[in-house]
C-alpha cells in the first residue's frame, strides 16, 4: 500500500503536503536556486515519489484510510528568484569531465525534465524573479 507519510529526506528541496496539494520549494537561495547535481537529483526523487502518490497513478481520490492522493503539484523557489537555470560552476566543471560523466549528467537532466513533463499531477510554477 502507498503511504503519504515519510517523503524522502532532502536538503535542497522542501516538500509540504496539504490534502491533495504538494508544494515543492527549491531551497538554494544563495545561488538563486541554480540547478546543481544535488538539486537535480533531489527533484527527480521527489517527482518520482509524488507521482506514485498521485490520483493519476493510483486511479483513486483517496487511499483506504481516506487520505487524499495528490492532484496538484506547486513548484516554487525560495528567495527573490525561482531558478537561475544550471549552476555555472557545474557547467564549468563539465568541460573537464569525461564523455561518460557528461553522458550521465545528460541522462540526469533528461530524467528531471521528463519527470516534470510526464508528472500525473496538475503542475503549477510559482515563478518570481529569474
Go through each PLM region and give its residues:
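Glycine-rich beta-to-alpha active-site loop
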Residues: 110-130
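Short beta-strand/turn micro-motifs composed of small residues
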Residues: 76-77, 127
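Histidine-centered beta-alpha loop that forms part of the nucleotide-sugar donor binding/catalytic region
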Residues: 27, 86, 128-129
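Conserved CoA-thioester-binding segment of acyl-CoA-metabolizing enzymes
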Residues: 1-76
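Short strand->helix junction
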Residues: 32-33, 81, 130
Amino acid at each position: 500500500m502507498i503511504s503519504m507519510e515519510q517523503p524522502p529526506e532532502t536538503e535542497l528541496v522542501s516538500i509540504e503536503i496539504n490534502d491533495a496539494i504538494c508544494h515543492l520549494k527549491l531551497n538554494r537561495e544563495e545561488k538563486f536556486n541554480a540547478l546543481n547535481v544535488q538539486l537535480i537529483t533531489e527533484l527527480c526523487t521527489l517527482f518520482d515519489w509524488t507521482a506514485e502518490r498521485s490520483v493519476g497513478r493510483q486511479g483513486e481520490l483517496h487511499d483506504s484510510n481516506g487520505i487524499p492522493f495528490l492532484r496538484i503539484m506547486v513548484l516554487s523557489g525560495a528567495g527573490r528568484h525561482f531558478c537561475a537555470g544550471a549552476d555555472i560552476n557545474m557547467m564549468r566543471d563539465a568541460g573537464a569531465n569525461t564523455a561518460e560523466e557528461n553522458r550521465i549528467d545528460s541522462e540526469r537532466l533528461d530524467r528531471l525534465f521528463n519527470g516534470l513533463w510526464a508528472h500525473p499531477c496538475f503542475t503549477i510554477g510559482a515563478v518570481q524573479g529569474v
